[in-house]
């Protein structure tokens, strides 16, 4: 029951195949400016697509990554947290965590649609009352190298299972993606 209940029954997105380029998309940064995903190609990037502040498992995952921010920063790697939640919730998350990550709002879930990680009407019933949109994103982590090529992707099929931050660090080391921070 527990595994069945928490399964997304998802298929891997063909847009996130290792070795391919991360498709281009636009999101808003916390200042409300439109940012193109290609602007992250200057350094390796850990992209964490999360459902929003309402999801306790997403928040646990993000807090674990935030606790490792010094190690990640020392590697010269960017972290982009992307969610389709309301922009005010993204700003709130950035203020609460106070780490040098890129906090992004995926307006109308356009980035998730581009990447094939958008389950229509995936938000639990009742969350709309709190200002969340009915559509959400499937929790996904993508690591891109400098230039935007995908070197690793985790598309969980069980919303309770997320990779630990050490896995990201191991991938970055194993792929030789450490760029000393300046």
Write out the residue ranges for each language-model feature.
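Short hydrophobic alpha-helix segments
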Residues: 38, 115, 152-154
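N-terminal "domain-start" segment that seeds a small globular fold
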Residues: 9-38
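Thiol-/selenol-based redox modules, centered on thioredoxin-like
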Residues: 128-182
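Short, internal strand/loop/helix patches
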Residues: 94-138
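Short active-site neighborhood of thiol/selenol oxidoreductases, capturing the structured segment around
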Residues: 37-65
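Transmembrane alpha-helices
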Residues: 1-9
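Short loop/turn microsegments at loop-to-beta-strand junctions
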Residues: 22-23, 44, 138-140
